[in-house]
């Protein structure tokens, strides 16, 4: 793909070197896609807008927050977005990609092996409920993201226990209603967290509306969270 075919909105956010990395990443995902079915969003604007731009605008258009040199965890990483996108554009950060599918984590490891990432990138094949109860990971991350994983209240229970006191959680959502806002606030009250900001963006090329919710701890998250496997999804916290 030529530089000219990459959407201009994305060209404003990334360097020439980063463009080449994203081009190579697309090829690596394509190579593995046929046997793992990592994603259908791999061609043209589906890749450059729905994957790359959608992952990056949150970090690149928010000048008030510093995202470099962080310990970062991507929950439910799937084909590697936003984790790989963050890794390419923030090469001094330490990256953890978590997914419960062994096929997907094996593919993520293979992509890392084939590419020349500058970061230390670690892939974890486990449920986030198990990862979040390990003392080596609990309350240790500066940034935690989740994209297209589950409802916001469930995702908040995955994210908050991973964050250190000044950490930032980033939830990528499609539609966002007043009811979602109320439910998330109730959940965060239990988790000793709060909503910092909600940003909405119309993605280029009519790729839809994206809402990004920034959350953070207001006190130490109780050690009983996250609950055991499936509890957060089946019984979301209601406050």
From Swiss-Prot:
Main localization category: cytoplasm
Subcellular location: Cytoplasm
Residue sites binding S-adenosyl-L-methionine per the record: 76, 81, 99-101, 128-129, 147
GO cellular component: cytosol
Pfam families according to UniProt: GidB
Isomerase as UniProt keyword: no
The EC number(s) this enzyme carries: 2.1.1.-
Enzyme class label: transferase
InterPro entries (UniProt xref): rRNA_ssu_MeTfrase_G, SAM-dependent_MTases_sf
General function of this protein: Specifically methylates the N7 position of a guanine in 16S rRNA.
Family assignment from sequence similarity: Belongs to the methyltransferase superfamily. RNA methyltransferase RsmG family.
Listed name of the protein: Ribosomal RNA small subunit methyltransferase G
